[in-house]
Amino acid sequence: MTEGHGDDIYRYDDIRINFSSNVYTHADLSKLQDHLREVIYLIRNYPEPEPFTLEAIIARKQGVPADCVLVTSGATEAIYLIARTFALQQESFSASILHPTFSEYEDACRMYGIPTLSDNDANAHSILWLCNPNNPTGSVVSPEKIQQYAQQFDYVVVDQSYEDYTQAPMLTPQDVVSSDNILQLHSLTKTYAIPGLRIGYIIAPSHLIGLLRQYMGPWTVNTLAIEACKWLMENDVRVLPDLNTYLTETERLRQRLNQIPGIKAAETQTNFFLAQIKPYTAAELKDYLARSHHILIRDASNFRGLTPHHFRISTQTSQENDLLVNAIEEFMQRKKTFPTWE
């Protein structure tokens, strides 16, 4: 559902502060840009048909065998690859999805004819899709609970794209490769704040990685994405802010929003969170912020299970966060009608 995602900055003429994307927007990528200028000549040649050199680096960094790693063009390609692979392997197959969550799990299943269940019960040849930390709620499922799911379902896909934005315990790559039915998705896009390069990877037991390779086309990951991540990982580059400071600021922003009559911001374990506005809609608020304050938020009403009143916020700098709060206060004051939250 490509038109249903956030970060639709292209729809507006002059967005100056972007709260819509969960990717950190203030990363200093200047040294990476310098490196890419040095290797730009590589675009004259085809990339590796399968990026084995980067997979070897990832395997070494994560402490797993290289045949347990598969690099993809972002975590989204991994989602569709997994759905395609299992759809072609099994005649009777269904998926369970914990809503609200990232829409691509359901979209990928629909594309390949995998029925999705309305509840979370396991059945024959079942796969559970789990976003952890979850987008859009920011909640985290414990490793112990995931292991329980692995006993209940034939396969469990754990999308850890936002793992670098939480302090909660995560399922480790070692836990995954020692299982026989867990697939773990990682997003280098999120880790290094490079969404335009589209790169991620899967960690899974070697027999599952081997199966996925059979259904993956050649040259799906471009040269610059491969070279960027090789350089970033080999040089142990970190572009995200201090996580403790970042999450403290997230909580400050959430509390400030909760002081506005008509706004209710939910708890979170990461840098983004859901909020509700009543009696107005998220679409009204989004349009006002974009056109009057050059601020972009995520209208979350298209997440299954949410309402037209839900929106999502991703923490920015303290100054930018205060500008958002002031702009929302202004919107509510202009409307001058506030609900009573129960």
Regions found by a protein language model. Name each.
Residues 29, 50, 181-259, 263-266:
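PLP-dependent aminotransferase class I/II
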Residues 30, 280-287, 319-323:
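Short, conserved charged micro-motifs
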Residues 53-94, 112:
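Phosphate-binding glycine-rich loop
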Residues 117-169:
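Active-site phosphate-binding strand-loop segment of PLP-dependent enzymes
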Residues 144, 291-292, 305-342:
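PLP-dependent enzyme catalytic core of the Aspartate aminotransferase-like
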Residues 247, 260-293:
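Conserved PLP-binding catalytic core of the aspartate aminotransferase-like
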